[in-house]
């Protein structure tokens, strides 16, 4: 919808960014994933968000399945918040720095909070396997906010019974030396970098010809801004206060 597209252009303007293109998270992820996986290997890339998780199963350039699971890391963060008496930011920092999770749901409450998420991912994998018995999933890549939780790769490996690694290095992607990759870890940048490769191209009607790569429902999607200097996407973070204000405006628009 026009008002939704406009809200993201407004977001970019308020953040002092030049909006080059808009994309949705599914397409953006796919564009980068295709450059990171083996041509003959079937790979599932799991983007762990706070409220939902996006699954992409690919083989070479072919997208075999894409699904969104309505669970994210919020349930885990909430358990740590309650247990430690801290805010959400501190809880996530603890999850990233301390080994709070194990490989067994029954070991502790924090690990158990992953149960619904991983079980739902398992159901998607079972569905995929029933439709593609000749193309079994051979490995899993973890990306997104939750990928840096310490020990999460081991948990997913054991529970999903498939080789799992964190997508914290990107092949053939060169970052500007001024970017601190300890702060702007590649797991946070998969979608903005992918959007620069081949975005859908949602445009404002009054900003020129409105074009998209394909027709169809825009549906509820998470749009992202691809800026001109997309290689330095992580540097364009703005102040917390301004971000909160802009986010609230977008929520009201949507």
Each language-model region and where it sits:
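Ser/Thr/Pro/Gly-rich low-complexity linker/stalk segments immediately outside membranes or between
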Residues: 241-252
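Positively charged, low-complexity intrinsically disordered regions
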Residues: 211, 252-253
């Amino acid at each position: 919808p026009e008002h939704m597209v406009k809200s993201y252009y407004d977001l970019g303007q308020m953040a002092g960014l030049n909006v080059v293109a808009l994309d949705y998270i599914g397409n953006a992820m796919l564009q980068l994933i295709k450059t990171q996986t083996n041509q003959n290997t079937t790979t599932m890339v799991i983007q762990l968000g706070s409220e939902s998780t996006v699954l992409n199963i690919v083989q070479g350039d072919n997208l075999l399945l894409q699904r969104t699971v309505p669970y994210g890391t919020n349930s885990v963060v909430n358990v740590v918040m309650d247990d430690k008496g801290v805010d959400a930011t501190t809880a996530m920092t603890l999850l990233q720095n301390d080994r709070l999770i194990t490989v067994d749901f029954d070991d502790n409450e924090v690990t158990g909070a992953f149960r619904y998420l991983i079980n739902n991912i398992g159901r998607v994998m079972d569905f995929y396997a029933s439709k593609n018995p000749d193309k079994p999933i051979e490995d899993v890549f973890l990306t997104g906010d939750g990928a840096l939780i310490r020990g999460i790769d081991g948990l997913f490996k054991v529970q999903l019974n498939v080789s799992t690694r964190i997508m914290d290095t990107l092949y053939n992607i060169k970052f500007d030396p001024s970017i601190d990759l300890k702060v702007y870890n590649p797991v946070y940048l998969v979608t903005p970098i992918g959007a620069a490769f081949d975005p859908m191209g949602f445009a404002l009607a009054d900003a020129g010809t409105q074009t998209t790569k394909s027709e169809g429902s825009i549906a509820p999607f998470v749009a992202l801004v691809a800026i001109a200097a997309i290689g330095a996407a992580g540097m364009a973070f703005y102040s917390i206060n301004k971000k909160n204000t802009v986010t609230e405006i977008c929520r009201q628009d949507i």
